[in-house]
Amino acid sequence: MNTLEDRLRAVEDKLAIFHLIASHPPAADSGNGGYYRDAFMPDAVIDLGTKTAQGNEAIAAVLKTPEHQAVIAGGLCHFAGLPRVELHGDTAVAISYLQVIAPNREAEPVELSGHGLSSGYRIHRLGVNRWDLKRTGDGWKVTRRAYRMLDGTEGARELLQEAAAK
């Protein structure tokens, strides 16, 4: 990556990937299946450790399930960290943290000046995403997303070790 054009392309690629990954939480929290149809390849795989879905239509359909609709109606939200992106020509790998946050219905409400009354939130889970991406004629697309909960098991640490090793 010596030329100015090469460096500019790398910056543009990373910004496009940042945008794609940053769009995931609002899509999940609003039930926007269109994001998954557009951002994921038709044969993409999402591997959540406990379950998988294959194909962008199947992945998008998860958002319309009664279970997902119930949790977003209850205030659940996804909060993503900035991904670490490694470019490899027309493919890329991104590693990022993802917090799943829920209203804390059991806490006593607290008033904060200028911010109103709230019982606060709690981190329901914290995990690691690995995003495998491919450059297409329509921009970067997800070919595979793997998520592992940071719960002391090996899966999440393996994903983090990949990012730290580079």
Model regions: which residues?
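Short, low-complexity N-terminal intrinsically disordered segments enriched in polar/charged residues
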Residues: 1-26, 30, 38
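Short helix-capping and inter-helix turn/linker motifs at the boundaries of alpha-helical repeat units
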Residues: 11-15, 73, 120
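Short, glycine/acidic-rich beta->alpha junctions
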Residues: 16, 75-77, 124-125
